[in-house]
Amino acid sequence: MVNVGINGFGRIGRLVLRNALQMQILTVVAVNDPFLDVEYMAYLFKYDSVHGRYQGKVETKDGKLIIDGHKIAAFAEREPANIKWADCGAEYIVESTGVFKTEELAKEHLKGGAKKVVITAPGSGVPTYVVGVNLDKYDPKEVVISNASCTTNCLAVLAKVINDKFGIVEGLMTTVHATTATQKTVDAPAKKDWRSGRSVTNNIIPASTGAAKAVTKAIPDLEGKLTGLAFRVPTLDVSVVDLVVRLEKETSYDDVKKAMRDAADGKHPGIEKGIVDYTEEDVVSTDFVGSNYSMIFDAKAGIALNSRFMKLVAWYDNEWGYARRVCDEVVYVAKKN
């Protein structure tokens, strides 16, 4: 078992813990969040408006979070350097605060006894790895790495299959993205991006995203070929990527569908089974709540204008599915070390 500490017990932090308990490969031994006492941690973990009530036993005792009898140390430190990871044996840290995203800041965890740090966001100046795309290039000498974003995890896998099979000349990506915690429930000031301050409950909000450009960190061959934007919408979970691509090779949409089916079956080089799913059913977003896949290709939603210009559609659970990939990445890093 791999001993893990979680810094930041927000949406991703809590779902990483749920996934770890389900997978039974990782052992979460400690959680740190300066804004939550242990009783509140237990409450937020037990009750979830999207993914439902945790079905096991959740309790607290002597300042520890106890889940199904498993004791988890609870810290409330503001600075990573002050978290005593070594006291509970946490070697691999999931950095899910959204704050400590540079190598310098994330390395502060090592002062408390950690060995490796995986950031659950695009990192600044940090090696980026996407499961099923470039994780095999991970260097065990690297102490801090990024698992990129939820959107990048979906888009990178989709782009890898298309680029490997048909070649991408250029592409534009739109993600129709579910609500996240940083958005406002009613109109409020947002100095950096005025539109992001508008109410999420009754608006479709155009937003910037670095997801498309971040794909090039995992697939350097696509440098300068992809960009994109986001629309934030009033749904709680599950997002969808709309990728319009110009292809190098002439092909048919049926050939694209076959390539995606093969990827879903684990037949595409580098993409293990369980990363990609494929559907031809009449699905909508809530059908993918709790999906483990990085990318679910929606064959019915896509369309081809001609043999080299196509619109491709792929779903992803931006919470649960992403948290599963974080766990997968930690497992891989631990095996390599």
From Swiss-Prot:
Belongs to the glyceraldehyde-3-phosphate dehydrogenase family. Gene3D superfamilies: Dihydrodipicolinate Reductase, domain 2, NAD(P)-binding Rossmann-like Domain. It comes from Agaricus bisporus (White button mushroom). This is Glyceraldehyde-3-phosphate dehydrogenase 1. Its EC number is 1.2.1.12. It is found in: Cytoplasm. Pfam families: Gp_dh_C, Gp_dh_N. Keywords: Cytoplasm, Glycolysis, NAD, Oxidoreductase. NAD(+) binds at residues 11-12, 33, 78, 318. GO terms for biological process: glucose metabolic process; glycolytic process. Pathway: Carbohydrate degradation; glycolysis; pyruvate from D-glyceraldehyde 3-phosphate: step 1/5. SMART domains: Gp_dh_N (SM00846). It catalyses: D-glyceraldehyde 3-phosphate + phosphate + NAD(+) = (2R)-3-phospho-glyceroyl phosphate + NADH + H(+). One of its GO terms (cellular component) is cytosol. D-glyceraldehyde 3-phosphate binds at residues 149-151, 180, 209-210, 232. One of its GO terms (molecular function) is NAD binding.
